[in-house]
Curated annotation (Swiss-Prot):
Cofactor: [2Fe-2S] cluster; FAD; Mo-molybdopterin
Tissue expression pattern: Expressed in liver.
Enzyme class: oxidoreductase
Cofactor notes: Binds 2 [2Fe-2S] clusters per subunit.
Primary gene name: AOX1
Ligand binding (FAD): V262, V263, M264, G265, N266, T267, S268, V269, A343, S352, H356, D365, L409
UniProt keyword Protein transport present: no
UniProt protein name: Aldehyde oxidase 1
Active site per UniProt: E1264
Source species, domain of life: Eukaryota
Binding positions (Mo-molybdopterin): Q112, C150, A800, F801, M1041, G1082, S1083, V1084, V1085, Q1197, L1262
Subunit field text: Homodimer.
Organism: Cavia porcellus
Length: 1332
């Protein structure tokens, strides 16, 4: 068959392609073929939103143009025939005009690293094309599928809200009060307290003008109106794509290719082919078949075409619900409820109703409801039409109930509900939106005579087995029973007996899932009872009071953000930018997609791609490695092994590639080099390795302790007389807390490009790294070259957080080796799953403590032991342990303290630095100890915190003097700003009247030491050139990874040289211009490099002083020309030797830190005791920032770090299998905070400026400190859990573990449902996952 031609538009320009490979997705095509690099690769599975574009299509049936967001990483190029694609470049640019969305996100300070920003822009843009004045709920829905690791989302939401309708009301009357009227817990604030400083002027924003948008191409409209004559066929190397254009063609194609999947949005088949190794040689993708888009309201039900997207289904259901009487819409409302939280907007607009039904995923949110409602599927074939029930047999793929191979799903009919029929749907996930359900359920009951006697009952659960499960026997036995609590108890017993979840069930969380089975049943019972009461109050009593709080899920509510920052000094010159909220200087480029990251760089001539082969075993000997099949594949050039590297394979105590054994799943074994990325990855899958498992296999901290498996010797600090203090203590307790690890989840994965220069063995490296010098050194060592022949360049990094240092150097060294060996450029971009598997993250911690204290809560003795899971190599683990010990006391003076730390050697990928560097773990252990002391003393944790807090001038446990007046000020200000006492009383009142939902309030202090522990690690350099036109080029050793260091450095130059910031340019960081620079991290990047930049500027000014003094009113252009004429150098090197710092671990004493950042945070939450869900109601943060160089950037660091910390402590859960494999390898399984997790109210306050003569303009580094404040949310949750436990007569204290996920919250709120579930005997099964 002759290949078809593909026509579509991109940014208003026609694209014509022949011979399209069906395996080509839109994302790589945009970057490689069209050089549109603004659309980013973040995960490859539609889970992060970085690749969002807008797709526009003309609907021949309605005559309307539909604009919707889509994930380019999952959009097959073949599917775009007749569509118009808009990328971020097509929305606006610096060369043409900025779109209001781009302008407002940038000027609202909504970008940091900028890698997620194009996706954010496109999600908002697509929303505005359909809803020019959206509601706040529509805004939240539009951004639910976009992840950001830097900003904390608040400034992005602020930008989006400028387009919203003036009323931001939640449109509901939760507890009978509108969200705009109720304050928090009924505590109203004074009018003045609700105002906020402006960081940008909304009046200056360009108004949105829908008439100025790109029009839909008339050519495509004409093309769509013409009835196509025949199916389109595209044939690639491995896959054939058939696009039938009529139902007849579709049925014919399916008859000829009965095993071929029918693909509409590619959101199910696409990930299966990419991540699960499923292969389909033929794919059928209908295009524009009207019968697949039918919407028909009949007398008995609603018929929806299988080709409708889930977003279209959502819109249709919302319209129909408004038209029909309530009694007919039970099923429709249940489906709507599930659709609101199902995936992100991009996926809902791509995925089809038919695809969702036919995929029959075990955790499908719609199928349990559709099956419970007895829906019917219409399935034609060439042999005729059939109707089959969508029931449990269909969902379990029973051959007698399934579609025949030649049939297609055409439509589904959803029956209207009847009077006295009730349908409900529930789901529980790790995150409120855009997260797969852990358990979901569809439930329907029918009381035929309206007498409360069950005539029909249907309950289907998802997420509890290999397929959706129907509790058939339980439902049958309950028919004829009255709807009473006795019936409920019997129903719970029957369901638990029928729906069995084995202890070793895939997915884990077994007891939680069992509890949800009956918790959801209880909620269904209550909702039906309440409906019965409304319909016939005489017969059915109201549930108001006892059970009212259990009826509904948590409501997210209205969002508000305020901040009180610092203003610039009134005495400084107007043009002096220091202290002013200057926008991130790459902000506009972030929003237009013009900011270039490593993988955006153009292809180099004859460039190669590299893909790694990693170990599938955690501890094993390599018996053999067969490369023959991989080497025989087309395009494969070479495979690099440890043997090729020789003695260069080893550096420090690590190896680049495995030699004779592997130490973890994800250990690098070899690297495949091929002409393209696709060829390299396919070849990597063909490398055959034979292993022999070795003993012992050590994964957990407990196993490491058992096998005495540790790196180095322990680290120890001690002050006072601990033994004597314990003897005199009035009370003593012992406890422990386990804290899980955390994935960096920088939005840009590990990326590098090695380019041999062609002579003298020179090589240039373009790497996404925090430490170019280290990359340079390791690569030079591997290539056996002097360092001066290896140059590392970094323009910007798409997020790092400590994760782009050690492992990045290993990846870069192997990439550079391949490049130099073949004298060709080599590019290596890790996929998200590879990145998460290989690179490690934050160390899991086990903290054990013994504490002696007085009855007033004052701690007199503390003996603490830290165990960190370091993984298979040492990496940064020793320094993490050290920093954890040095910072462990947080804000408290413990007079007698002993603390020890151990780095456990295990068979996991090496863990490494992550924002906070040990303090988020060690600080949490201390706070958990404080909470337990408070419970033992019958005091609030806040009272115990105050009793033990540093006061005035003190000495730390390592002997450094500390002045803590600002700490006390932060604490008292936070208490006042948060109206803590009033809200504490309000929370208690709420809890007294709400048995099933509880609120919690917690406040934690912060003392974060800043410094790197040695002088040498703190040195920095800068280079400043003044050109003859008066412009300045600045280079320094710091890396721009989102924190705005380049912006701050240009502010420094502007102040020192008294010139506009626009006159100063900074191209990036390079070992060629500033050699031997230290790592960018530890909150000191701006501090150290800023002092070097300041030194360079002052050197220049001193050199030019005679010239300037002769012409004081001259311009820089005139001064530069005069200096040149007098042979005076216009270049200056600035240098800062580093802060004075030392630490003697033998003596346990020293002065490792230059200064301390102080702060406090108060958070309020509400939990759902039935499901474990929680919502973040409000957070107040007070920070001591010294004198802020840029309040807007500093606010972004505080908020972003807080949200990242909140994720660490509540939702981000790494899951490992019992053989050491990481399960959580992408946003589908690993849940960082999303827009829905941001506190409804977030208030940030900076203390007035303070002076510190040693730092840059008295500023303080804020990159890491805010992470720890996220634990205020954890302790607020625990406060709520404790309230629930006290009410149930349970001990208020229970061993804390972190993260405090919905599973842990629910299981801690013990009740009759947790007690009725079956329990497995430990040791009788192998659990699906292990706690490492």
């Amino acid at each position: 068959m002759e290949p078809s031609t593909l026509y579509f538009y991109v940014n208003g320009r026609r694209v014509t392609e022949k011979n399209v490979d069906p395996e080509t997705m839109l994302l790589p095509y945009l970057g490689r073929n069209l050089r549109l690099t603004g659309t980013k690769y973040g995960c490859g599975g539609g889970g992060c939103g970085a690749c969002t574009v807008m797709v526009s299509r003309y609907d021949r049936g309605t005559g309307q143009i539909r604009h919707y967001p889509a994930c380019a990483c999952l959009t097959p190029l073949c599917s775009l025939h007749g569509a118009a694609v808009t990328t971020v470049e097509g929305v606006g640019s610096t060369r043409t005009r900025l779109h209001p969305v781009q302008e407002r996100i940038a000027k609202s300070h909504g970008t940091q690293c900028g890698f997620c920003t194009p996706g954010m822009v496109m999600s908002l843009y697509a929303l505005l094309r359909s809803h020019p004045q959206p509601s706040e709920e529509q805004l939240l829905e539009a951004l639910a599928g976009n992840l950001c690791r830097c900003t904390g989302y608040r400034p992005i939401l602020d930008a989006g809200k400028t387009f919203c309708k003036t009323s931001g009301c939640c449109q509901s009357k939760e507890n009978g009060v509108c969200c705009l009227d109720q304050g928090v817990n009924g505590v109203q604030e004074a009018e003045g307290e609700q105002t906020s400083q402006e960081l940008c002027s909304e009046e200056e924003f360009v108004p949105l003008d829908p008439t100025q948008e790109l029009i839909f191409p008339p050519e495509l409209m004409i093309l769509a109106q013409k009835q196509p004559q025949k199916s389109r066929v595209f044939t690639g190397d491995r896959v054939t794509w058939i696009s039938p254009v009529t139902l007849k063609d579709l049925l014919e194609a399916k008859a000829k290719n009965p095993r071929a999947p029918v693909v509409m949005g590619n959101t199910s088949v696409g990930p299966e082919m990419k991540f699960k190794g499923v292969f389909h040689p033929v794919i059928i993708s209908p295009d524009g078949i009207e019968e697949l888009s039918v919407i028909k309201q009949g007398n008995e039900g609603l018929t929806l075409g299988a080709g409708l997207s889930l977003a279209q289904v959502q819109d249709v259901l919302a319209d129909v619900v408004q038209q029909l009487p309530e009694e007919k819409t039970q099923t429709l409302c249940a489906l709507l409820k599930q659709l609101r939280t199902l995936a992100g907007s991009q996926i809902r607009n791509m995925a089809s109703l038919g695809g969702h039904i036919m995929s029959r995923h075990l955790d499908s949110d719609l199928n349990p409801v559709l099956a419970a409602a007895s829906c019917t599927l219409h399935v034609p074939s060439q042999e005729g039409d059939r109707q089959i029930p969508l029931d449990e047999h269909f969902l379990s793929r029973s051959p007698s109930a399934d579609l025949r191979p030649q049939e297609v799903l055409l439509s589904v009919t959803i029956p209207y509900s009847r009077k006295w029929e009730f349908v409900s749907a529930f789901r529980q996930a790790q995150r409120k939106r855009s997260a797969r359900a852990i358990v979901n359920v569809g439930m329907r009951v029918f009381f035929g005579a309206g007498d409360g006697v069950i005539s029909e009952l249907c309950i289907l659960y998802g997420g509890v087995g290999p397929a959706i499960v129907c509790a058939t026997d339980a439902c049958r036995k309950l028919v004829g029973r009255h709807w009473t609590e006795e019936m409920l108890d019997e129903a719970c017993r029957l369901v638990l007996g029928e729906v069995a979840i084995p202890g070793a069930a895939p997915g884990g969380r077994v007891e939680f899932r069992r509890t949800l089975l009956v918790s959801f049943l209880f909620r269904f019972y209550l909702q039906v009872s309440q409906s019965l009461s409304r319909m016939d109050p005489g017969r059915y009593p109201s549930l108001v009071g006892k059970y009212e709080s259990a009826l509904e899920d948590l409501c997210l509510g209205h969002h508000q953000r305020t901040f009180e920052l610092q203003s610039a000094d009134a005495k400084q010159l107007p043009q002096d930018p220091i202290g002013r909220p200057i926008m991130h200087l790459s902000g506009i480029k972030h929003t237009t997609g013009e900011a270039i990251y490593c993988d955006d760089m153009p292809l180099v001539d004859r460039e190669l791609s590299l893909a790694f082969v990693t170990s599938s075993r955690a501890h094993a000997a390599i018996l053999s490695m067969d490369l023959s099949e991989a080497l025989s594949l087309p395009g494969v050039v070479d495979i690099v092994t440890a043997e090729h590297l020789g003695d260069a394979n080893s550096f420090a105590k690590e190896t680049l590639l495995a030699t004779d054994k592997v130490l973890c799943v994800g250990h690098l074994v070899c690297a495949v080099i091929a002409d393209s990325e696709v060829q390299a990855k396919r070849a990597a899958e063909k490398v055959k390795i034979v292993y022999q498992d070795l003993e012992p296999l050590i994964l957990t901290i407990e196993e490491a302790i058992q096998h005495d498996s540790f790196f180095e010797t322990e680290r120890k600090l001690e002050s006072g007389d601990v033994a004597e203090a314990f003897r005199t203590a009035e009370q003593v307790l012992e406890g422990s807390i386990h804290m899980g690890g955390q994935e960096h989840f920088y939005m840009e994965t590990q990326s590098m490009l090695a380019v041999p220069k062609g002579e003298d063995q020179e090589i240039d490296l373009y790497v996404s790294t925090q430490f170019p010098t280290y990359i340079q050194e390791i690569v030079a060592s591997t290539l056996k070259l002097p360092v001066n022949k290896v140059m590392c360049h970094v323009r910007r990094v798409g997020g790092a957080f400590g994760g782009k240092v050690g492992k990045t150097a290993i990846l870069a060294a192997i990439t550079a080796f391949a490049a130099l060996k073949h004298c060709r450029a080599v590019r290596c971009i890790l996929e998200r799953g590879e990145d998460m598997l290989i690179t490690g993250g934050r160390h899991p911690y086990l903290g054990k403590y013994k504490v002696g204290f007085r009855n007033n809560g004052q701690v007199v003795a503390l003996d603490m032991e830290h165990y960190s899971n370091a993984g298979s190599t040492l990496d940064e683990s020793l320094m993490v342990v050290e920093m954890g010990l040095l910072k462990m006391e947080n804000a408290y003076k413990f007079p007698n303290l002993r603390c020890r730390g151990h780095a456990c050697k295990t068979n996991l990928p090496s863990n490494t630095a992550l924002r906070g560097f040990g303090f988020p773990q060690s600080g949490l252990i201390t706070e958990a100890c404080i909470v337990e002391v408070a419970a033992r003393c019958g005091l609030s944790p806040e009272e115990v915190r105050e009793v033990n807090m540093y006061r005035g001038t003190e000495q730390t446990h390592y002997g450094q003097e500390i002045h803590t007046q600002r700490l006390a000020q932060c604490w008292s200000e936070c208490k006042a700003k948060a109206t803590f006492s009033l809200r504490r009383a309000a929370v208690d009142r709420f809890n007294a009247g709400s048995p099933w939902k509880k609120r919690g309030l917690a406040m934690v202090p912060l003392k974060f030491p800043v410094g790197l522990g040695s002088v040498a690690m703190g040195q920095a350099a800068a280079l400043v050139h003044v050109y003859l036109d008066g412009s300045v080029l600045l280079t320094h050793g710091g890396i721009e990874m989102g924190q705005g260091v380049h912006t701050k450095m240009i502010q420094v130059v502007s102040r020192e040289l008294k010139m506009p910031m626009a006159n100063v340019h900074l191209r990036g960081t390079s070992t060629e211009t500033v050699p031997n620079a230290n790592v960018s991290g530890g909150s000191v990047v701006a501090d150290l490099n800023g002092l070097a930049v300041k030194d360079a500027c002052q050197t220049l000014l001193k050199r030019l002083e005679p010239i300037i003094s002769k012409n004081p009113k001259g311009t820089w252009k005139e001064w530069a020309q005069a200096a040149f004429d007098q042979s005076i150098s216009l270049s200056a090197i600035g240098y800062f030797r580093g802060y004075d710092a030392d630490m003697d671990w033998e003596k346990g004493k020293g002065h490792p830190f230059e200064y301390f950042v102080y702060g406090a945070a108060c958070s309020e939450v509400e939990i759902d005791c039935l499901t474990g869900n929680h919502k973040n109601i409000r957070t107040d943060i007070v920070m001591d920032v010294g004198r802020s160089i840029n309040p807007a950037l500093d606010l972004g660091q505080v908020e972003g770090a807080f949200i990242q910390g909140m994720g660490l402590y509540t939702s981000e859960e790494l899951k490992y299998g019992p053989q050491g494999a990481l399960y959580t390898r992408g946003p589908d399984q690993y849940k960082i905070p999303a827009v829905c997790d941001v506190p409804a109210e977030l208030h940030v306050f900076f203390l007035p400026p303070s002076k510190n003569s040693n730092t840059l303009y008295s500023s303080k580094g804020l990159g890491e400190s805010g992470v720890f404040l996220g634990c205020s949310v954890l302790f607020a949750i625990w406060d709520a859990v404790s309230a629930a436990r006290r009410e149930r007569g349970l001990p208020g204290t229970l061993a804390l573990s972190c993260p405090l996920t919905p599973e842990k919250i629910r299981m801690a709120c013990e009740d009759r449902f947790t007690k009725m579930i079956p329990r497995d005997t430990p040791g009788s099964y192998v659990p699906w996952d292990v706690v490492v």
